């Protein structure tokens, strides 16, 4: 930890009237943090964090205002959220509705915002030399927004579309039931999203002018004294200070008092109740919720963090360990959430098995047995000290945050913590206060708990409905004798305190990097059964590393049955390792295990000190694979539910899924996997695992604080295990591990695939324009098309035409092929939506042809900025390198090569490409359109919808059978490697 040094005052200081009333140069930061920080408070009360990073390739800013949807007027639910939407749509100084987003888009940036119960946050990122202009536009949100009548009327549709997107989301539904059950006069009970009914229809019926209410809300609450701003740029602190003073001093200080809610949200009768909720998806969960006082002031002692650490622990002796042993649960989470303004919740959430659902009272009792054990044991200083040590270690070696993430996190922390502690405060719980731990523990008792259970099996018993989402729920009181058994529970001998964490690293030395160290990953071992890549980090200078192992066996994706067996093997492996891995994860050492079409992939990342210990444990499990039959049954049922639940995912996700199913060479459909699950047995998984691990090819990449000698030693450990199998006798051939390929559409092709959906009100249209095989030139050209189209597409289809909340345009780059896709999720029929997409493309062709040369060059530069943005962390650099290795392309300087081509693209080249591949009658145009059609009808509709004219569907050839479609299509070639490296695996002797 160190103190940011004071900087000298700039010679071009603003007049004294523009001086801040407070300037702090003692912002506590991590020892290795090279950025400079300064805190300010302006005369209008605005708190500011300035971050100077001369080497940044992205600038960013965020602003939080400490008002959210809990401050909505009672007669206008959703007004705070609506206000957030409207600020993007024009200000007095910059009146064009899309002026802000256009500026950002042409400057390599983008923006977003979110409304929370107590806070609203706005943020953006942009090319460094465009920060000044972006800040000027951003500041006007909070000074003089327009709220034009036209935009107000239209944007209500976007808010409503966002709400309709969330209607089938169990997360939103359950949250709103909990709010609905709060005291009706408490702000926590409000409906924060808003919809057309609450923001248009009801207000109109009561002669309420919503635009006037928006203006009043902004005027009342958007006050500088409850705002926090964070800015990061390449400029000096003095230069950044000058920019902020000039642009943000105009925000009015209305001396707003931050709203607070010291009363708890639930009436006394709500405690001791069981709330049963019927979900859309087949999920089962139990939540034990305790309402607490606001604990924000105790951030330096963190009593909630101490209890969260123990109650949510996953090692031996934990609640989760005991519930898994009994077969009642798969997962458990615990944590405290402060409102920061009066109250909070301590929640324990249990993911239930089918058997667990029948033992809810027993599970709750086990939780209270654990809490009773904690009371009897009392707070332990050594456990607290271990948590302090972990936090100090995380802060000391904190990775460099992405600029936009940094400022977005900062403006939240600035609302809570002193400015000088804004960076360190989340890691600062180092004051030992056992009295606070005991006090909080005394609040976690049966008489102060709410029990919420979620399961589809409750449908017959639930006769109540939440008004906004229509979620069915029911309420019963917990029997008195049950409550008494919880209150007077005996200790459970299986529940114990966590043991000391053996994974906490002790060696933080950075290995010396040889002067002749290669710039890119190189192969240090290559045999028919094992290929090892290595690159020692010489950039981030942290005691961290990443290593990944890609284990391939062609049996993994042979058919839907084997695909399921592979998936089950991975699930069981992760399940077996869970207790052991939890301590490692607490010590910032993470293992991820993933199934993939060619087998499994596992990655270890974090502090380099104990990685080999974790690797050895993993190898033991891999090559001596065993299965607990009870856990097999539980995990099989969980996997089947996940396959069935796919049908309730968002329509846009379905459109993406079906496009991949249509174009990928070999892809098993969800229904094919579901049918094959009937054949998945305990013995089959066991036999599959034995066969899989007996004949493998493994590709490994080791990156970070690892020398070549250390990497060679790791390779030797893996090789020893592989040589003990049959892999060395009969290795996997290179041609058994060829990458998947993409089906090729021909010039002039235009196909339509249509699928019905009964779970969502919204439909979805995806227009996919295939653009050819991946090459540096094609890659950068489709990226440039995406760059130029993105903002105007959003502005036209979402902001102006209000087709729906989800509007996306971008590149689809998979399986060696490139393309552009436009996705719109809408209440309107996909055929109509596609017609509007085509109309936009046709209209925009003329815009591109008439585009001034300087505007086209701005787009090129914006794309170059995005492409050349450097990885900020070891893991990001590792992922970039490994992406090339996994795809077997080895083009480690791809971004630089593509940008070199980009610099040479003329406007005429671009217009010609757009006309050929994107425009409606382009000679090279290849279209595959996917429509997801809602089968729901609008229950609130008072008249039949007006018919809309659809002009472009007759040119599509419908796809009625996926197999038939694929049977008559060629495949694109696999992208060839950039470097002359032979394909991994054994060479054929033919």
Swiss-Prot record:
It catalyses: Degradation of insulin, glucagon and other polypeptides. No action on proteins. The active site is at residue 84. Optimum temperature is 37 degrees Celsius. Disulfide bonds: none annotated. Binds 1 zinc ion per subunit. Its cofactor is Zn(2+). Induction: Inhibited by bacitracin and sulfhydryl-specific reagents. Optimum pH is 7-8. One of its GO terms (biological process) is proteolysis. Zn(2+) binds at residues 81, 85, 162. One of its GO terms (molecular function) is metal ion binding. InterPro entries: Metalloenz_LuxS/M16, Pept_M16_N, Pept_M16_Zn_BS, Peptidase_M16, Peptidase_M16_C, Peptidase_M16_M. GO terms for cellular component: cytoplasm; cytosol; mitochondrion; peroxisome; plasma membrane. The keyword Metal-binding applies. Belongs to the peptidase M16 family. Can cleave insulin and TGF-alpha. This is Insulin-degrading enzyme. The gene is Ide.
């Amino acid at each position: 930890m160190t103190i940011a040094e004071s900087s000298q005052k700039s010679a071009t200081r603003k007049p004294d009237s523009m001086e801040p009333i407070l300037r702090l140069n003692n912002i506590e930061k991590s020892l290795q943090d090279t950025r400079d920080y300064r805190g300010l408070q302006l005369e209008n009360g605005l708190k500011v964090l300035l971050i100077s990073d001369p080497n940044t390739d992205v600038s960013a800013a965020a602003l939080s205002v400490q008002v959210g949807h809990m401050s909505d007027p009672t007669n206008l639910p959703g007004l705070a959220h609506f206000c957030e939407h409207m600020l993007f749509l024009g200000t007095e100084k910059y009146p064009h509705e899309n002026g802000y987003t256009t500026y950002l888009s042409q400057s390599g940036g983008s923006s977003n915002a979110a409304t929370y119960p107590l806070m609203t946050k706005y943020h953006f990122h942009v090319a460094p030399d465009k920060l000044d202009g972006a800040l000027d536009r951003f500041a006007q949100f909070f000074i003089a927004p327009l709220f034009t009548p036209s935009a107000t009327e239209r944007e209500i549709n976007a808010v409503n579309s966002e709400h309709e997107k969330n209607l089938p989301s169990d997360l939103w539904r359950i949250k709103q039931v909990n709010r609905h059950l709060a005291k009706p006069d408490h702000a926590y009970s409000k409906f924060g999203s808003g919809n057309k009914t609450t923001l248009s229809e009801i207000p109109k019926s009561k002669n309420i002018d919503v635009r006037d209410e928006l203006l009043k809300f902004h005027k009342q609450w958007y006050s500088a004294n409850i705002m926090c701003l964070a800015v990061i740029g390449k400029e000096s602190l003095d230069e950044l200070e000058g920019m902020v003073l000039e642009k943000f001093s105009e925000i009015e200080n209305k001396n707003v008092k931050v709203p607070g809610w010291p009363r708890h949200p639930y009436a006394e009768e709500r405690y001791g109740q069981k709330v049963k909720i019927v979900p859309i998806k087949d999920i089962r969960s139990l939540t034990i919720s305790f309402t607490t006082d606001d604990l924000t002031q105790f951030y330096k002692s963190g009593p909630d963090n101490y209890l969260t650490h123990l109650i949510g622990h996953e090692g031996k002796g934990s609640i989760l360990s005991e519930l898994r042993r009994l077969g009642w649960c798969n997962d458990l989470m615990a944590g405290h959430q402060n409102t920061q303004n009066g109250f909070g919740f301590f929640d324990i959430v249990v993911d239930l098995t089918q058997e667990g659902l029948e033992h809810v009272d027993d599970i709750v009792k086990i939780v209270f047995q654990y809490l009773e054990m904690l009371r009897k044991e009392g707070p332990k200083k050594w456990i607290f000290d271990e948590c302090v040590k972990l936090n100090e270690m995380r802060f000391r070696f904190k990775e460099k945050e992405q600029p936009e993430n940094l400022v977005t996190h900062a403006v939240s922390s600035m609302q809570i913590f002193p400015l000088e502690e804004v960076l360190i405060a989340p890691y600062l719980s180092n004051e030992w206060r056992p009295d606070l731990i005991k006090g909080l523990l005394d609040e976690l008792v049966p008489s102060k708990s709410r029990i919420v259970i979620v399961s589809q099996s409750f449908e017959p018993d639930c006769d109540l409905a939440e008004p906004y989402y229509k979620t069915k729920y029911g309420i019963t009181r917990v029997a008195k004798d049950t409550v008494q058994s919880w209150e007077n529970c005996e200790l459970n001998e299986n529940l114990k305190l966590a043991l000391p964490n053996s994974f906490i690293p002790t060696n933080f030395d950075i290995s010396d990097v040889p002067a002749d160290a290669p710039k890119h990953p190189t192969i240090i071992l290559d045999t028919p059964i094992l290929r090892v890549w290595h690159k020692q980090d010489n950039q981030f200078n942290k005691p961290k590393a990443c290593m990944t192992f890609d284990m391939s066996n062609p049996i993994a994706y042979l058919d839907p049955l084997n695909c399921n067996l592979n998936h089950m093997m991975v699930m069981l492996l992760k399940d077996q390792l869970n207790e052991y891995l939890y301590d490692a994860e607490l010590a910032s050492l993470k293992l991820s295990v993933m199934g993939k079409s060619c087998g499994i992939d596992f990655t270890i990342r974090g502090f380099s000190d104990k990685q080999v210990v974790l690797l050895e444990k993993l190898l033991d499990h891999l090559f001596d694979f065993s299965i607990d039959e009870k856990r097999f049954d539980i995990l099989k049922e969980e996997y089947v539910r996940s396959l069935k639940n796919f049908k309730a995912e968002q329509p846009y996700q379905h459109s993406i899924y079906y496009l991949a199913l249509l174009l990928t060479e070999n892809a098993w459909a969800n229904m094919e996997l579901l049918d094959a699950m009937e054949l998945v047995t305990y013995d089959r998984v066991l036999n599959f695992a034995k066969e899989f691990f007996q004949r493998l090819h493994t590709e490994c990449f080791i990156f970070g604080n690892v020398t070549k000698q250390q990497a060679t030693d790791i390779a030797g450990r893996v090789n020893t295990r592989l040589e003990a199998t049959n892999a060395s006798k009969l290795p996997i051939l290179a041609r058994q591990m060829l990458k998947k390929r993409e089906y090729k559409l021909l010039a002039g092709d235009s196909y339509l695939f249509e699928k019905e959906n009964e779970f969502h009100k919204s439909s979805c249209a995806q227009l996919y324009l295939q653009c050819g095989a991946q090459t540096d030139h094609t890659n950068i050209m489709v990226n440039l098309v995406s760059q130029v189209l993105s903002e105007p597409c959003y502005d036209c289809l979402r902001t102006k035409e209000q087709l729906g909340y989800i509007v996306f345009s971008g590149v689809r780059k998979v399986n060696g092929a490139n393309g552009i896709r436009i996705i719109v999720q809408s209440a309107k029929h996909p055929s109509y939506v596609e017609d509007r997409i085509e109309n936009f493309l046709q209209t925009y062709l003329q815009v591109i042809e008439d585009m001034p040369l300087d505007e086209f060059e701005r787009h090129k530069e914006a794309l170059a900025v995005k492409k050349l943005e450097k990885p900020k962390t070891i893991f990001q650099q590792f992922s970039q390198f490994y992406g090339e290795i996994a795809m077997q392309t080895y083009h480690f300087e791809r971004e630089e090569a593509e940008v070199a081509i980009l610099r040479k693209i003329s406007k005429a080249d671009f217009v010609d490409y757009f006309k050929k591949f994107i425009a409606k009658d382009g000679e090279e145009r290849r279209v595959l359109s996917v429509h997801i059609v809602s089968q729901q009808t609008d229950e609130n509709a008072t008249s039949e919808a007006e018919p809309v004219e659809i002009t472009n569907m007759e040119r599509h050839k419908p796809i009625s059978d996926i197999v038939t479609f694929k049977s008559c299509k060629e495949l694109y070639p696999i992208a060839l490697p950039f470097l002359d490296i032979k394909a991994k695996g054994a060479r054929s002797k033919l």
